[in-house]
A protein has these predicted regions:
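Short hydrophobic/aromatic residue motifs in ordered secondary structure
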Residues: 120-121
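Thrombospondin type-1
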Residues: 2-101, 105-112, 124-141, 402-410, ...
């Protein structure tokens, strides 16, 4: 993503009467803990002009402070709307189709050759409603299955980690062409959607699971979000649930744990317990795709919501659009699934049994090389024959009953809803541990419900059609909204944690992940194992300044490495303190 991420203006100069606090809370404080910080918002902006298409007007607000140290989180909408009257007509987009085109009832333009060809090219069947004769179907008499890989192509991505609720593409449109691709595993032919310039089935999988062990929260959380923070300048800011849209996210796209209903609760439950974290992951690739550069067929709902976006920039409404469709879409990528779990192991219980974290890893079967093409029954038999040969445990159930595993966190992506629901139920009930058997069962469902696991991204604004009214303005507004969205939910608004702790912004609340030597909401409580001089403080960036005025087509902004500043041999902030952008 471009590094030109715009920060909303410096807000601390506003008067006290410009702030709105969200529900004061009282919490039981630890000794020496900082005072709780409640969510603090600006007051609402003035109402904007009446939008002629939606006949509504909008206003927005911003977040000044996120909840921290036990304070109330910011999980509120930043947009508001009300009905209004306007004499300005909504632009009528009908009647713009060419002479050689058919105009669908929903406004799409089709080539005349697609009318009455037995396929729903319009999306509302209006091209097939009045046919005295039908043309030869594009695929003739052959039955060609719909490709789930093709349906998934172009999947939206939200830079803060949320799974977009809808796709921008109509990937069951074929433009009257019967291009087929063959799945080498099943020998089944699938029809390639028009939107994909390239679609290929190429099943591959990691030969073995990658298993890593961590001794503290901070290292574990940083590792989980390392890939995201390397791709986008979002540091440790995570937003998995929409606040501007009432559309729920999909199962498996976020965070699920056994004893913890949220990542915040997971951090609280594991803080100060000295666990060992076993991080297990494996990827399965089913195929690859590349989207067309031009003439993409966009979904009717995407175009409709784009039409109703106000031309005057209203931050909250544009945030809602981004949370529905993504800040970016996948221009090309790899489709399949990610199997990722974190086991929280009780260090003391391990020691009392004379075991290591690697022993638990073997008992769970993640040291085995399980081929992804294996039959589920055969793979399960192989697992049971080889796993869990330790002096203490004979099988996985004995591991569960021993209390060695305190919690399991699921970061699984892909697989059918039924399979993911079952895994989540196992997590919450603790009736049975999730082990490599469940991986084999999950992998078998990926062809029915794959996701994009690696991608090259393009801003969602690039999908704005030139022919819609105010297309250039709305494209610029979407680019601005992405910058504002990242700045609005930035960890730079969090107060520094104490004693080398790392601040994270999770679901509207600043959380501190502590080093092994401290615990507490702010990492303020030393543990009994604390030895003075063991805590290095890594530097963290403060928020970006406002952009400078535009000169010779360029502008600048700056930030400081003082939130906190590095100390006691800690690392300096990664990245640059000065950013230049075009204007």
């Amino acid at each position: 993503m471009s590094s030109s991420l715009l920060l909303i203006g410096v807000l601390c100069i506003l008067g006290a009467n410009s702030f709105a606090s969200v529900g004061k809370t009282r919490v039981t404080q630890e000794p020496n803990a900082p005072e709780p910080i409640d969510c603090l918002l600006t007051t609402w902006s003035d109402w904007g002009p009446c939008s002629p298409c939606s006949e509504e007007r909008y206003r927005s607000r911003s977040i000044l402070k996120f909840g921290q140290f036990g304070g109330k989180p910011c999980i509120v909408a930043l947009s508001d709307r009300e009905p209004c009257d306007t004499r300005t007509p909504c632009p009528d987009e009908r009647g713009h189709c060419g002479k050689q085109e058919f105009e669908c009832e929903n406004g799409y333009c089709l080539k005349n050759r697609l009318v009455c060809n037995t396929e729903n090219d319009c999306g509302d069947f209006s091209d097939e409603d009045h046919c005295d004769e039908t043309k030869r179907p594009p695929c003739g008499n052959r039955e060609v299955d719909v490709s789930e890989l093709g349906r998934t192509a172009g999947q939206g991505v939200n830079v803060l980690g949320m799974t977009p609720a809808q796709t921008a593409f109509q990937n069951e449109f074929y433009n009257g062409i019967c291009d087929r691709v063959r799945d080498g595993n099943t020998a089944i032919y699938y029809r390639k959607p028009w939107n994909t310039a390239v679609l290929s089935y190429d099943t591959r999988g990691d030969k073995r699971f990658t298993s890593e062990f961590y001794s503290d929260q901070a290292s574990t959380i940083k590792e989980i979000f390392k890939t995201k923070s390397q791709t986008f300048d979002v540091n440790l800011s995570v937003k998995l649930k929409p606040t501007e849209s009432n559309v729920s996210t999909t199962i498996g796209g976020g965070f699920n744990a056994g004893r913890s209903s949220s990542m915040s609760e997971f951090l609280k439950n594991t803080k100060g317990t000295n666990p060992i974290y076993l991080h297990v992951k494996s990827n399965i690739q089913l195929g690859t795709f590349q989207m067309r550069k031009r003439d993409l067929r966009l979904s009717e709902t995407f175009l409709e919501e784009l039409k109703f976006l106000p031309s005057t920039y209203e931050k909250g409404e544009y945030f809602k659009f981004l949370e529905t469709y993504g800040t970016h879409y996948s221009q090309r990528g790899t489709v399949g699934g990610k199997y990722e779990l974190i086991y929280v192991l009780d260090n003391q219980t391990l020691s009392s049994h004379g075991l290591t974290a690697e022993d638990v890893n073997r008992c769970l079967g993640f040291n085995l090389g399980i081929t992804i093409a294996a039959d589920v029954a055969e793979a399960t038999a192989e697992i049971k024959a080889k796993q869990c040969k330790t002096s203490r445990f004979k099988n996985v159930d004995e591991v569960r009953r021993s209390g060695v595993i305190q919690d399991v966190v699921s970061l699984i992506q892909g697989g059918t809803t039924a399979t993911l629901t079952r895994l989540n139920e196992l997590l919450s009930s603790n009736a049975r541990l999730i082990d490599v058997e469940h991986y084999v069962e999950w992998a078998a469902t990926l062809p029915q419900a794959p996701v994009v696991i690696r991608q090259e991204l393009t801003p969602i604004s690039e999908l704005v059609p030139l022919k819609i009214p105010d297309s250039r303005t709305k494209k610029e507004n979407l680019d601005r909204a992405v910058e504002d969205y990242v700045a609005e939910y930035s960890v730079c608004k969090c107060q520094p944690c104490l004693h080398g702790g790392t601040a994270m912004l999770i679901e509207g609340k600043c959380e501190c992940t502590c080093t092994p030597f401290y615990k507490g909401d702010a990492c303020e409580i030393p543990k009994s194992t604390f030895v003075p001089g063991q805590t290095a403080i890594d530097g963290s960036w403060n928020c970006w300044s406002n952009w400078s005025t535009c000169q010779n087509g360029e502008r600048q902004r700056t930030r400081e490495c003082n939130n906190p500043a590095p100390g006691s041999g800690g690392k300096s902030c990664p990245g640059t303190s000065v950013e230049t952008g075009h204007c």
